């Protein structure tokens, strides 16, 4: 969002976890620095209304393209990404989050193999389009149980259903 709002670089966000409405509510609260509960209630001070009006213009003018298709396949994403780059000059793609994607039409021995295939496909797409693709990922719960400050720092091996993501 910041890349689109403050630097005016076109960004595509594929949100498999949250709806457009949920994302927009979160962004408005973040950009305006006003708690979402306060915005929803409408109980804002005059200066907060002014801030909301001023900051919303930045958000509305941002070249941000959001797709909240649930259970998006890597093939559907590839088609949409190519179109967004061609038609809107998208400079970065963000996927929230990797493990909710699927590689429809293909059969796999395990979910780990499927996620690895999706990861490799995204890497190939990034090379083809010559833009970064950032795929968010969930972590295994083991991170929470490790001792000490350094122990809680996530490592590539902590990625859920990671398989070959470390190599991609």
Label every model-predicted segment.
Residues 20, 101, 140-143:
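Feature marks short, surface-exposed loop/turn motifs that line or immediately flank catalytic pockets
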Residues 92:
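Hydrophobic "anchor" residues on beta-strands that sit immediately upstream
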Residues 102-109:
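Conserved ATPase-coupling elements of RecA-like P-loop NTPase cores
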Residues 113-168:
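Phosphate-binding/switch region of NTP-binding enzymes
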């Amino acid at each position: 969002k910041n890349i689109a709002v403050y630097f005016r670089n076109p960004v595509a966000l594929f949100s498999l976890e949250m709806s457009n409405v949920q994302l927009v509510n979160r962004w408005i609260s973040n950009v305006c620095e006003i708690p979402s509960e306060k915005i929803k209630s409408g109980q804002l001070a005059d200066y907060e209304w002014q801030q909301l009006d001023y900051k919303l213009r930045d958000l509305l003018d941002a070249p941000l393209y959001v797709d909240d298709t649930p259970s998006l396949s890597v093939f559907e994403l590839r088609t949409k990404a190519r179109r967004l780059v061609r038609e809107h000059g998208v400079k970065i793609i963000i996927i929230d989050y990797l493990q909710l994607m699927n590689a429809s039409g293909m059969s796999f021995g395990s979910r780990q193999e499927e996620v690895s295939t999706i990861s490799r496909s995204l890497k190939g797409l990034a090379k083809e389009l010559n833009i970064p693709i950032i795929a968010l990922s969930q972590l295994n719960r083991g991170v929470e149980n490790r001792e000490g400050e350094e122990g809680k720092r996530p490592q590539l091996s902590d990625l859920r259903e990671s398989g070959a993501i470390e190599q991609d």
